[in-house]
UniProtKB/Swiss-Prot annotation:
Pfam families: EF_TS (PF00889). The gene is tsf. The keyword Protein biosynthesis applies. It comes from Ehrlichia ruminantium (strain Welgevonden). This is Elongation factor Ts. Residues 79-82 are annotated as: Involved in Mg(2+) ion dislocation from EF-Tu. Its main location: cytoplasm. One of its GO terms (molecular function) is translation elongation factor activity. It is found in: Cytoplasm.
Amino acid sequence: MKVDINAIKELRDLTGAGVGDCKDALTSCNGDIEKAKTYLREQGIAKAYKKSNKDVSDGLVAICIDGNKGAILEVNSETDFVARNEKFQKLVLNLAFLANQYGIENIEDFLKCEYANNTNINDEIMSNIAVIGENIHLNKIGCLSVSSGVVCGYIHNPIVDNLGKVGAIVALESNCDVEKLKIFARQIAMHIVATKPEALSLDVLDQNVIDKERDIIKKQVEQLNKPASVLEKIIDGRMAKFYQEVVLMNQMFIMDSQFTVSELIKKKEEELGSSINIVDYKLFIINK
């Protein structure tokens, strides 16, 4: 049958599939656009599963913030070329929005959630794999919320708003002025992206990380031929410096190196007249 060029254009606009694929679909479905959409979806998903085992080494990080809750996620692609594809970017931003709406960090559970028009998130990703032509992998999700306070985020060198290669969200609990708290929270998020801490506070830093670093330092100072009591003080001093590098609350604040983050919070509490607590943060870096 002869396929109407306008039908091909409409189907292409609806699905993002190529002209040839749209023509084949309409031919197979006797010009019925709805059936052709289903046909393309079935064919596309079959192609997508073949692509879904390819390595992914690029991608984007997206954030979505809504007052006292926020989400961050990392979606991987095979190449930077696709990471700069407008359709891929729209997908990633939509996924961040849904992650914030659902508040689900578990990937398997999130993929089962509704996307739109009775499709689930996994189906939408597979559909995009078929259209874009590269594997797409949802790598991780982070969600934060507070009952009183704010969640803020920061993307370094954004490609478009809320989308880039490195990003962070942080949750601050406080009863102080919300707008002033937002400014401070964004500064903390920027600090996190710049310094890349491994833990919020010393009490949640992995004990294995602590033990490994202490063992390394111990072996380094053994060669100094000092009394044991002196060596122990040297070890403690170097460990304190290590904590200042990897623990957020112990780090020197990048915008005012006179203060650690912990000291700055106390200063802000006095300034804003209310206690401030960093509940948690999430830092995502492509392929790290």
